[in-house]
Amino acid sequence: MTSADQPDPDRLLAIYLQDHRAGAAAGVALAQRCARSNEGTPLGDVLAEIAREIDEDREALDDIMGRLDVSESQLKSLGARAGELVGRVKTNGVLTGYSPSSRVVELEGLIAGVSGKRQLWASLSATASTRSELDEAELRALFARATSQIERLEAEHHRAAVTAFSGAGTAL
C-alpha cells in the first residue's frame, strides 16, 4: 500500500470530531430533558449538575475543534437531534406522563453517551503528543470528569432500576 492509498489522518480526525460533536448535541438535549423530568427530586438535582457538565464538555469539544480548524457538521448534528427526538417516542407502560421504566432507559442512554465521550477524550489524549493543538492536561481532566459522570449516573441507574422493577426502592 502506498502513502497515496492511506487515508488522511486530518480528514479522519475531522470526521471523528464531527461525529462526536453531533452526539454531544443530542447528549446535552437528553440530559437537560431528564433533569427537567425529575426536577424537584434528588435525582433531578444530580441530573441538572450532570447536564450542566455535559454542556460544558460540548463547549470544550467546540474549542478543541476550533483549534484544529474543524467545523461542526450541521447535517450530522441535525440527524443526532432528530434521533434524540425519536427516542422520546417509546412504549413505557404509561399512557401519559413519565414512567419509572423511562427513567431507567434514559439513564442508560446517558451512561452510553458519556462512555462514548470518555473514549473521545482518551483517543484525543493518545494523539496529543503529535498535535500541538491538543492539551493533554485538559484532556485528562475531561476524561476524569466523564468518569465521575458515569459513576454518578450508574448509581442513579441502580436506584431507578430498583424503584421501577422491584417496587423496593424509595422515591427518586
Predicted regions and their residues:
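Alpha-helical transition-metal enzyme core signature, strongest for iron centers
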Residues: 17-31, 47-61, 82-89, 110-117, ...
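Amphipathic, non-membrane alpha-helical segments in soluble helical-bundle scaffolds
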Residues: 10-21, 44-51, 72-79, 100-114, ...
